[in-house]
Amino acid sequence: LARLLQPDTRPALEFELPWPWGGERFALNDIRPINHIVGPLGSGKTRLALRIAERFPGAVFLPLDRAEGDATATRLREDAGLRARVDAALAWLVEDGATGSEALVALLAGLEAEGPAAIVVDMVEQGLDHATQEALIAHLRRRGAGARPLFLLTRSSAFLDLAAVGALESILLCPANHSPPTYVAPFEGAPGYEAVATCLATPEVRARTQGVIAWRPTVSDPAG
């Protein structure tokens, strides 16, 4: 319980926060095998993720459009070892209820790559259905304490089930008011917990609202 509540105090990675912050000095003091990055739209999640990928030695960034084009297919054709690892992971995930898709294969190609010291993923749930997200997070948790760090942006309650967060995971909240990111413990009543919870929604809700822009009807002219 104490391990979940209290982050490590050892400075692991320090950098200046990018816009929309004001260049404040920030330290990632609690880097674990799985690091969730959460925040509302416009809170700076992706810019923070890019800064982490820039400043973490040997890290790579998997963008939102990772499944587009033929880059993944080309990599898998040219790297038999990567292909074997992706096939093995895909088989495990499908057996656990996941749906095979180009989005999942592209994500696995990034996650199973040899070489990167850390992997930063923009919206890890992109293109994945509910069951696939649940299978994926279970798969990632099985990597154990010695696994290389993953920084995973998410707004999905299927992928980030707050009741299931374990000791090998951290939650980093990007607040709506652009105050510096803060670590949040996965317990009701913990500082920031409600803010994290309100950022998350099921894949079904996310699918219905994806791309929706708020609209306010025009008030009719009474004289018209």
Give, region by region, the residue ranges found by the protein language model.
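C-terminal lobe/lid and adjacent interdomain/linker elements of RecA-like ASCE P-loop ATPase modules
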Residues: A131, A135-G224
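Conserved P-loop NTPase "ATPase switch" module shared by AAA+ and STAND
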Residues: A113-A131
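Conserved nucleotide-sensing/catalytic segment adjacent to the nucleotide-binding pocket
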Residues: A71-A118
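Post-Walker A alpha-helix
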Residues: L48-A49, A53
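Hydrophobic anchor at the beta1->P-loop junction of P-loop NTPases
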Residues: I37
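Conserved lysine of the Walker
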Residues: K45
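P-loop (Walker A) phosphate-binding loop of NTP-binding proteins
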Residues: P40
